[in-house]
């Protein structure tokens, strides 16, 4: 992140407020106003409140769950959480570490990356995904759920509201199809969706938004992976397909992804069909109901 410059009076205010808030937590509203005035906002929901801290929110508890879970059980670099604040409708604000570095999207588009730099970053990405996939699922079933399995999930691919958890991949896939039974899926969506949703998959912990803007780079390596709001337990292909649910227009990024993490090209074809024909299945509009149930 670019270093900000301040005049003397602003620096004194920042030092005073930062010192006070370290030992005596100020109201959230005060800290957010202070951050917006003296630091910066990082759209859509992040405010920098000191030289080394940000507050993100309102967000769903599943994001906090994921940050704490991944930090505890892996060595994947994630921001440290300091405290939370309650918000309306069951949401929270999370005060966390501001990781020093530049997001990969900005770095790639602004300066480009040499082949050696890309190789180093992709090696780190491979290691991070491998660590997430090594985590044992909380149950033996093929669930789709948050880190703790207790909270609802969120995902821009699905819609603005929480959804799930699901007791099986079949139930999740039916949800993605808008309730269309697997028996009529081929007629409704075509062979790619039918074939993908007829397979059995392992369950892996998944970031589910592992795109360049959420990867912080420092000294040529991954310093942190941020924005864990979409993460949870998903079918094994979800990480790969969700990386492609993004508008980052650099073919060399996607080429590197194909070499860094397990590929699921058939599932990506199925997902692209659903993105076109039935996007945001979590939005309440229409949903197939079997008259026999």
Task: Describe the role of every protein-language-model region.
Residues 58, 208-211, 227:
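Domain-wide signal for the mature, well-folded portions of proteins, strongly enriched
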Residues 36-159:
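ATP-binding pocket architecture of kinase catalytic cores
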Residues 86, 118, 125, 131-208:
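An alpha-helical support segment within catalytic cores of ATP-dependent transferases
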Residues 1-36:
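Juxta-kinase regulatory segment immediately upstream of eukaryotic protein kinase catalytic domains
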Residues 279-293:
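ATP/Mg2+ or Mg2+-diphosphate-binding catalytic cores
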Residues 169, 200, 204-205, 218-270:
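Active-site Asp-x-Gly
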